[in-house]
From Swiss-Prot:
Pathway info: Protein modification; protein ubiquitination
UniProt keyword NAD, yes or no: no
Name the record gives this protein: F-box protein PP2-B10
Lineage: Eukaryota, Viridiplantae, Streptophyta, Embryophyta, Tracheophyta
Alphabetically ordered keywords of this record: Ubl conjugation pathway
GO BP terms: protein ubiquitination
Function: Component of SCF(ASK-cullin-F-box) E3 ubiquitin ligase complexes, which may mediate the ubiquitination and subsequent proteasomal degradation of target proteins.
PROSITE patterns, alphabetized: FBOX (PS50181)
MF-aspect GO terms: carbohydrate binding
Organism: Arabidopsis thaliana (Mouse-ear cress)
Domain notes: The F-box is necessary for the interaction with ASK proteins.
Length: 272
């Protein structure tokens, strides 16, 4: 038997409620639940289009995220634009967008915004433009033994009271080598406090028995990513904490080549 198709009800007990009352109730949910509510009845479908609801789902400073050249017909259209089209800022070295299901802020630091040891020496790292990156340039590893990448960001640009995960976003070229069976030390935490630590590997080839090593995963945009760790952002716009994320290999010191780094992405952690 096939799956039953959800049929939108022509009438609902809520049809007798004032529309502003329904809007008020739905505004205390989240974007995903609001879209589900729109399938309940025609009354809900109409109400969920209200600007009152979608403005509640937008961050308080959403106007600063709107490109000057863009005009939106509704707050709902604006919301989904901020979900689907990351906004570049800070000299186009960072991008911010909203997680579609929750409306929480997501952030990506470009490779140009990271601290990469020997990154300013073309003998070791090369800065190149590639069409599949959202940023002007990415970092291409030419040849190093000492591998160290660090990134920092103020928590004010993130959503408060939210657990986040940080990911390093990368690709490997055909001649990429030096990362097979090499564990990279990753750390994420508030600057000045003890960070959470783990081992990661840029290659899926890792020795058996090392189950604690986090492997890369394929992204929908064609890049690969590895989770560096998690942190909880408690504060809001008045909070002045900084989060530092790092990935380094400074012990084995074998030659490494061919990795392309787009940046570090921070987004709400998955709830298991």
């Amino acid at each position: 038997m096939g799956r039953k198709r959800r049929v939108k009800s022509e009438s609902s007990p809520f049809d007798s409620f004032p529309e502003d009352c329904i809007s008020y109730i739905i505004s205390f949910t989240n974007p995903r639940d609001a879209c589900v509510a729109a399938t309940v009845s025609k009354t809900f479908e109409s109400t969920v289009k209200s600007d009152i609801i979608w403005e509640k789902f937008l961050p308080a400073d959403y106007e600063s995220l709107i490109p000057p050249s863009r005009v939106f017909s509704s707050k709902k259209e604006l919301y989904f634009s901020l979900c689907n089209d990351p906004v570049l800022f800070d000299d186009d070295k960072k991008s911010v967008w909203l997680e579609k299901a929750s409306g929480k802020r997501c952030l990506m630091l470009s490779a140009m915004n990271l601290s990469i040891i020997w990154g300013d020496n073309p003998q070791y790292w090369q800065w190149i433009p590639i069409p599949e990156s959202r940023f002007e340039k990415v970092a291409k590893l030419r040849d190093v033994c000492w591998f160290e990448i660090r990134g920092r960001t103020n928590t004010r640009v993130l959503s408060p009271r939210t657990r986040y995960s940080a990911y390093i976003v990368f690709k490997g070229v055909d001649k990429c080598y030096g990362f097979q069976n090499v564990a990279i030390e990753a750390a994420v935490g508030v600057v000045g406090q003890e960070p959470s630590r783990r081992l990661i590997c840029f290659s899926e080839a890792i020795r058996r028995g090392r189950r604690n090593v986090v492997k890369p995963k394929q992204r929908e945009d064609g890049w690969m990513e590895i989770e560096l760790g998690e942190f909880f952002n408690d504060g809001g716009i008045m909070d002045n904490d900084e989060i530092e994320m790092s990935a380094l290999e400074t012990k084995q010191l074998n030659r490494k080549c061919g990795l392309i780094i787009q940046g570090i992405e921070i987004r709400p952690a998955k709830i298991l």
